[in-house]
Amino acid sequence: MLRLFYFSAIIASVILNFVGIIMNLFITVVNCKTWVKSHRISSSDRILFSLGITRFLMLGLFLVNTIYFVSSNTERSVYLSAFFVLCFMFLDSSSVWFVTLLNILYCVKITNFQHSVFLLLKRNISPKIPRLLLACVLISAFTTCLYITLSQASPFPELVTTRNNTSFNISEGILSLVVSLVLSSSLQFIINVTSASLLIHSLRRHIQKMQKNATGFWNPQTEAHVGAMKLMVYFLILYIPYSVATLVQYLPFYAGMDMGTKSICLIFATLYSPGHSVLIIITHPKLKTTAKKILCFKK
């Protein structure tokens, strides 16, 4: 039963990743065409362009790895499997850092906090976006290299099977690997949740203020604010389970977990990228308009 559930989770993840590939290819092409036509691109679209490319490569790599894994006629190589994992880890980390940067940009640009730090960021963050994107890539490369180093230095935990369950013999090296993974994920998690929460709070307060002062409450500006607030709420719903599931998947003793736990982690980890990409498209005016034209919908 658990094997069937795990196999169903793999099929669902393949379908979701295929959808994610199409969505991110769409985001990349639309932003690229805008960039070529106008010879300039906004800070948020620059991040979306980088995010679309990274997720397209990451999800494509996942599909290739899945086909390689389930193929019975292919001789599996340990080194090739490790290469897949490390490349996926680097691309996944880069995409999350790009999303983190995008959330920071939205938080700084949209919120009306008068703190000196917010005012300083509001004035200076847009020109720094190219450098910040490069910093995201370098941080992801560093964390991936750190994972490789600690994995090589730390032997994987030995499985000790008892009558009722399976326990692990965890060394100090394994603990250092786990601590490094938790610390690297925690920084992204704290920044994302904080920026999204601040933006939701600011937008909710702004909408309440408009509702009290305006005679006609529902207008295009209010609709845009509500859309941004919904995007952040749905982002948190997708991001928080994804962060936990991804962290569990990278832990050394993940291989010894039961099929049910692996299936749940796989579904949550896979749902985030395609789901967030769809949210970006339906809340971004230019992407939404282009998508409607492609689908032959009229306004």
Swiss-Prot record:
Localisation: Membrane; Cell projection, Cilium membrane
Residue intervals on the Cytoplasmic side: 31-46, 103-131, 194-230, 284-299
Protein name per UniProt: Taste receptor type 2 member 4
Tissue: Expressed in subsets of taste receptor cells of the tongue and palate epithelium and exclusively in gustducin-positive cells. Expressed on airway ciliated epithelium.
Record-annotated membrane-spanning stretches: 10-30, 47-67, 82-102, 132-152, 173-193, 231-251, 263-283
Residues the record marks as carrying a glycan: 164-165, 169
Function: Gustducin-coupled receptor for denatonium and N(6)-propyl-2-thiouracil implicated in the perception of bitter compounds in the oral cavity and the gastrointestinal tract. Signals through PLCB2 and the calcium-regulated cation channel TRPM5. In airway epithelial cells, binding of denatonium increases the intracellular calcium ion concentration and stimulates ciliary beat frequency.
